[in-house]
Amino acid sequence: MVYLQLVCFPKEVVPIAITSASLPAKRRILTVCVKLFLEKGYKRTTVAEIVQKADVSNSTFQNIFRAKDGVLTELVEFMFDNQFGMARRITDADLPPVFVYAVETAIQLTLTELNENLRELYTEAYTQKEASEYIRRAMARELYGIFGLYQPTLSEEDFYALEIGSAGM
């Protein structure tokens, strides 16, 4: 049995057991959700549609994700990690790290302009507790790595506080 940890609140973790038997169901659910969220939007997609199209039971869905917002958090983690990874691949290694941040921001802006339903996903991610907490923690780590050299007196936790403040603007 593999245990995954989902961040709910700072320093509080809820372990969810994922067995090798449930991994195919998880993949199907995520694939269906991406398709439905992009086609219909997050709010207009129901759990009933998801379980029907993913060919899983309600209990399987709930055991893996608890609720639709659990799927959103999983997708946020994937997107966040991939956006910074993409930004790193795009920027030249000789450029200052701040360019990675600029490119990642441009990627986010471009993605939200491409599709209204994708824009809705971003809005949901930043308003739901679990997803937004993941974003703030992960962004603080990235910002600390990028700007820590310019702000040597600040810790990663300071960057977390700055992220909370600037995210509310």
Indicate where each model-derived feature is located.
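N-terminal intrinsically disordered/low-complexity leader segments
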Residues: 1-21
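N-terminal positioning helix adjacent to the helix-turn-helix/winged-helix DNA-binding module
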Residues: 18, 25, 29-32
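Helix-turn-helix
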Residues: 28, 36-70, 74
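Hydrophobic alpha-helical connector segments
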Residues: 74, 85-118, 136-138
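CheY-like receiver
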Residues: 78-81
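Short linear capping/connector segments at secondary-structure termini
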Residues: 88, 121-128
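Amphipathic alpha-helical packing segments from all-alpha helical-bundle domains
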Residues: 126-169
